[in-house]
């Protein structure tokens, strides 16, 4: 179910304060965050946010198309290595 419009989009306070400081100082630093649930705001465009995937921080460069999506959508948590080849030896 979608979030109610009267509530507005969600962003963790610590992430928003870090991004506001970066925008004010006009620096381009990588911001580390564990907040995969935060929504991407328009003032994040052009910055890089390192989103935690459970193992490491994945750098995500924010573009205009990403606004309104969640940070976790761009840092996959599972690595798919493909199905194993059909081996005759393992079928015994």
UniProtKB/Swiss-Prot annotation:
GO molecular function: rRNA binding; structural constituent of ribosome
Keywords from the UniProt entry: Ribonucleoprotein, Ribosomal protein, RNA-binding, rRNA-binding
GO CC annotation terms, alphabetical: cytoplasm; small ribosomal subunit
Superkingdom of origin: Bacteria
Alphabetical GO biological process terms: ribosomal small subunit assembly; translation
UniProt keyword Flavoprotein present: no
Keyword field contains rRNA-binding: yes
Pfam family, one: Ribosomal_S19
Family: Belongs to the universal ribosomal protein uS19 family.
Role played: Protein S19 forms a complex with S13 that binds strongly to the 16S ribosomal RNA.
Protein name per the record: Small ribosomal subunit protein uS19
Source species: Bacillus cereus (strain ATCC 14579 / DSM 31 / CCUG 7414 / JCM 2152 / NBRC 15305 / NCIMB 9373 / NCTC 2599 / NRRL B-3711)
This protein's encoding gene: rpsS
